[in-house]
């Protein structure tokens, strides 16, 4: 890959990464793959390269993905009505068949293929495999009352042994966000990939949870671009949750869940930027918003980078 950096600048980039390579060696990093990074061909390639890079320098990446745009496209192509209530997809049994097919048969296979173009590293599995996830059907409060949105659930338990086996074998697990209903194991639920990634990060003792989005991070006062938060304590974030817009709230709730589960750091980063994961992990400034177990709030504009 050609860059405009001089040789000495390239060396500076590598040296800046050295302490982070040392600090994160052998650590597990759970990455929620989503947003524009899933639909733009160049960004998909960059994401696959990032996962391979992490693996080759001694980290253990674990990928969890959804597939909202791909599901919507397939439902439309098949003439199946797609309804949303309170920003959540109503998942009928007919739609669930499509969700399962798209996530495990299309999105997962494509990402596994992109990673494995660099060597036999990635293995696809879903929340159904090896009892990885168990979920409970969800009845969210919409307009003040519990609402039936069909076969949609929240992960309530994790058996990470299948993922642990893959990590021990040097593989990169790629996990699709569907899960059996804990009350009826023959029924499969569509689960939120952000929440599933947080639950898995806690279960495997991940050093970081990284969630890819289509925004720069969490803003304290959107649309003021100077209000981009660089670091925020989990209690400060918990206080903000009720006022967050519907697209950002589940991602920040996932960060809270990860921190509450013992994950030291959770990040929201802009997946529209090529190699954003490497920029977050291996540079001093990082990018996006980092959630920490302690208290406090720092604006990214205060960093001086």
From Swiss-Prot:
One of its GO terms (cellular component) is cytoplasm. It comes from the Bacteria. It holds the Pfam family AA_kinase. Disulfide bonds: none annotated. CDD domains: AAK_NAGK-C (cd04250). InterPro entries: AceGlu_kinase-like_sf (IPR036393), AcgluKinase_fam (IPR004662), ArgB (IPR037528), Asp/Glu/Uridylate_kinase (IPR001048), Glu/AcGlu_kinase (IPR001057), NAGK-C (IPR041727). GO terms for biological process: arginine biosynthetic process via ornithine; L-arginine biosynthetic process. It catalyses: N-acetyl-L-glutamate + ATP = N-acetyl-L-glutamyl 5-phosphate + ADP. It is an enzyme of class 2 (transferase). Belongs to the acetylglutamate kinase family. ArgB subfamily. This is Acetylglutamate kinase. It comes from Bifidobacterium longum subsp. infantis (strain ATCC 15697 / DSM 20088 / JCM 1222 / NCTC 11817 / S12).
């Amino acid at each position: 890959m050609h860059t405009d950096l001089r040789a000495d600048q390239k060396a500076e980039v590598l040296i800046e990464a050295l302490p982070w390579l040392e600090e994160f060696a052998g650590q597990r990093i759970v990455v929620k793959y989503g947003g524009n990074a899933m639909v733009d061909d160049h960004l998909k390639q960059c994401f696959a390269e990032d996962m391979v890079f992490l693996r080759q320098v001694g980290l253990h990446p674990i990928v969890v993905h959804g597939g909202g745009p791909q599901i919507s496209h397939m439902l439309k192509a098949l003439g199946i009505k797609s309804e949303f209530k309170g920003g959540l997809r109503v998942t009928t049994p007919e739609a669930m068949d499509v969700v399962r097919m798209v996530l495990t048969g299309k999105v997962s296979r494509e990402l596994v293929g992109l990673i494995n173009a660099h060597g036999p590293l990635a293995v696809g599995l879903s929340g159904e495999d090896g009892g990885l996830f168990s979920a409970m059907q969800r009845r969210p409060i919409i307009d003040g009352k519990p609402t039936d949105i069909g076969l949609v659930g929240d992960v309530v338990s994790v058996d990470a042994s299948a993922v642990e086996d893959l990590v021990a074998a040097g593989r990169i697990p790629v996990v699709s966000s569907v899960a059996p209903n804990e009350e009826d194991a023959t029924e499969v639920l569509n689960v939120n990939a952000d929440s599933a990634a947080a639950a898995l990060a806690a279960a495997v003792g991940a050093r970081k949870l990284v969630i890819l989005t289509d925004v720069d991070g969490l803003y304290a006062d959107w649309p003021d671009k100077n209000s981009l938060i660089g670091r925020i304590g989990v209690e400060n974030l918990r206080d903000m949750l009720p006022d967050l817009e519907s697209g950002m709230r589940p991602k920040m709730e996932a960060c809270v869940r990860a921190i509450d589960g013992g994950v030291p750091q959770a990040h929201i980063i802009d997946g529209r930027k090529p190699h954003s994961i490497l920029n977050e992990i291996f540079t001093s400034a990082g990018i996006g918003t980092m959630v920490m177990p302690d208290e406090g709030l720092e604006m990214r504009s205060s960093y001086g980078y």
